[in-house]
Amino acid sequence: RKQELVEAFEENLDFFIETSQVVRSDINLINMEIVKNYFHKKGIVINSSNEKFLMRSAGISYTDKDTGEEKCTLGGLLVFSDNNSLCIPQNMIRITNNLGKGKDRVNVVQGNLLSMIDKSEDILRKILPKNYPIGAIVEAINNAVLYREYSSIDRVIEVVISRNSTIVNSPGQMIQNNSTGKRINYNRRNMWLYEKLVTLDENKRFLNNEGGFGRIKKPFKKNVTFINSRAEDCFKVILPGTKLYEGKK
């Protein structure tokens, strides 16, 4: 399977799916303010003379061998582009509101990864009761954004809100064993993304990411279900719905 091949390359060949080349991309899609902020936080001065070198070295861009043009990597688009959906439409969070409150039933969130998390939180605050533990859903979205399988080009992160449950569905299962039977830590996926997000995130949402599952369960007294589906090749977080919080202050 494609995902297993990607996992094998990442494990044995020091290959990151995030640094794979996006042939039909344009370097002008990169938001240079985010790039400058990233290098500034690393203590590196970026200017016109070293810009291309630093971006290539960091895996944000590459030089097309045939045309000599600068183009974007997958990770470069995910982290540093506000309009990456033009090249990677799978980078999307779809929030479905089944509460029937007259608000937009489906909200589509796109952009660079950190902005997508912020936009999703804003949408959730408009949909959910004020006393609902929104932070738990945002934590699940954080994990989905960081660890989803970005090589799944026909699937997106889905958040479905109803009175009975709230579901966060992320493409790519939590692989525990590779094709040879060797155990793999879920947190090893997308390490390139992790480094970039940790560096850029002013809210420090990813610094203590290993405790994410605990932070998701705690507000609901552990009444949360995690489903790692090999058949569907996805990871689901199922939280309580809104009915327990309706009418409460």
Language-model segments: which ranges?
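Active-site helix-to-loop segments that bind/position phosphate- or nucleotide-bearing substrates
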Residues: 1-152, 157-166, 174-179, 183-188, ...
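Flexible, glycine-/charge-rich segments associated with ATP-binding catalytic modules
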Residues: 28-31, 86, 176-249
